Structure formats: C-alpha cells, structure tokens
C-alpha cells in the first residue's frame, strides 16, 4: 500500500487523475471502476481538462460504476448514471455503450445483480478501481457488517446514509431506501485500487481502514489485504495517521 499526502482537495484530485490517466495511456482499452459522490468530482474535472488539451483518449475505455439507487432511472438527476454523464461521460470521447452502471429500474434484485456480475466478468475484470471512503468506512454501498465474500447485491440503506442523502431530494420520502452495489469481493478482484479521502470527518475512518483490525464493521479495512492499493488523502484526513 502506498499513501500520498495531498496539500488540499485540488492537489488530491490532480494526483488521483494522474494515476487514472497513466492507466489509460498504458492500456487504452482498460476497464475503469468508477465512483460517485463529492470526492471524485475534482478528479473527473481534471481528466476532462487533460482530454480537452488532447492528452487523453477515452475512445477505447470501458467503465463500470460501483453502485446505483434502486428505483431511480438514468434521467433522474439524483441517479448515479446522471451524475456520471454530467461529471464525466458527456465531456469526453467515451462510447456510452461501454459505460456501465447498475440498472436502478430493474425491479428484480437477483436479475439486476447477476447481470452486473456478468458484465464485470465478461470484460475481464477491472484494471483500476476508484473508491471514495464513507465516514463509517463504507466503500460503494457496502455498509458496516457487509460480508466480505459478497458480489453485486441489493442493500437496504442505513439511516445515516439516508440522512446524508436527503439534502439532495425534495423530501426524505423521496430518498431511495435501497441500492444495487458491487460487493467487497468484486472490489477486491480489481487489479489496482485507488482510494481517495478528504476532510477531517474522514480521519477516523481512514485510520481504522488502513491500520485497524480487518473487520466487516469497517468495510474498507479489507483493502489492507489487496496487493496494489494507492491512497491519496489530504492533511485533514491523514491527521490521525501522519
């Protein structure tokens, strides 16, 4: 595991984008595992900037996203498909037929999850998986207590996650209560993992994930067992470690 300290969010985003762009340059037809939320927005902006300068070519890249809210379609502005289109896909020369997000409108969880596992397998797995870190150590929607051996599955969102998300919706009743997410097993099968974390509110989760016991109560702690993990975090997130 390699840990890089970033001066601030902009520096964190640039460092993360450097690693992703190197992956694309080294393997133009690579499979990228992508994340949503506030953490990777700056990374995606930097990738778009380099694409606009002619430094990056996404035409052969495949992307597979971590998760999606169950019941939200791609045109819903709170869906993760919409987020990815808005923050990355609409701004680069990627073939959207090669961008995958779980089907939030598939009502049958077994069908949705089996289909997504097959998408990952049929593309030969993920070359580089980008991850954010939840305040409770969650990765994707794998909340504390999630079994390490699970593949893509349907999860009931915790009260804390629903609470954190309600600011994005008109009312709490509109907040999805379930999501489809890649499991820990899918994530751990990625060839490389890039974990980004910023802010003092992530400090305890980052410390527990990197140096605490490996336990389902801190889902990201399993990353200690992966043989190629890069962590990029700012000074605030690293305050309990460095």
Task: Set out the residue ranges of the language-model regions.
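Glycine-rich phosphate-binding loop
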Residues: 124-150
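ATP/nucleoside-binding phosphotransfer catalytic cores, i.e., glycine-rich phosphate-binding loops
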Residues: 185, 189-242
């Amino acid at each position: 595991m390699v840990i890089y300290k970033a001066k601030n969010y902009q520096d964190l985003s640039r460092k993360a984008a450097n690693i992703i762009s190197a992956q694309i340059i080294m393997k133009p037809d690579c499979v990228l595992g992508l994340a949503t939320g506030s953490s990777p927005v700056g990374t995606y902006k930097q990738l778009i900037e380099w694409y606009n300068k002619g430094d990056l070519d996404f035409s052969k890249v495949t992307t597979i996203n971590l998760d999606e809210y169950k019941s939200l379609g791609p045109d819903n502005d709170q869906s993760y498909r919409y987020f990815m289109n808005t923050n990355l896909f609409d701004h680069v020369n990627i073939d959207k037929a090669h961008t995958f997000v779980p089907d939030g409108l598939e009502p049958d969880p077994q069908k949705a999850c089996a289909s997504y596992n097959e998408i990952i397998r049929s593309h030969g797995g993920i070359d580089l998986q980008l991850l954010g870190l939840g305040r409770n150590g969650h990765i994707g929607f794998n909340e504390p207590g999630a079994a390490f051996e699970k593949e893509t599955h349907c999860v009931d969102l915790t009260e804390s996650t629903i609470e954190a998300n309600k600011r994005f919706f008109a009312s709490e009743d509109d907040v999805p209560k379930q999501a489809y997410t890649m499991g820990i097993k899918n994530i751990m099968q990625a060839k490389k993992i890039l974990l980004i974390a910023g802010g003092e509110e992530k400090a305890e989760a980052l410390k527990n994930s990197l140096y605490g016991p490996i336990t389902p109560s801190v889902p990201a702690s399993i990353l200690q067992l992966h043989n190629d993990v890069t962590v990029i975090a700012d000074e605030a997130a690293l305050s309990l470690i460095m």
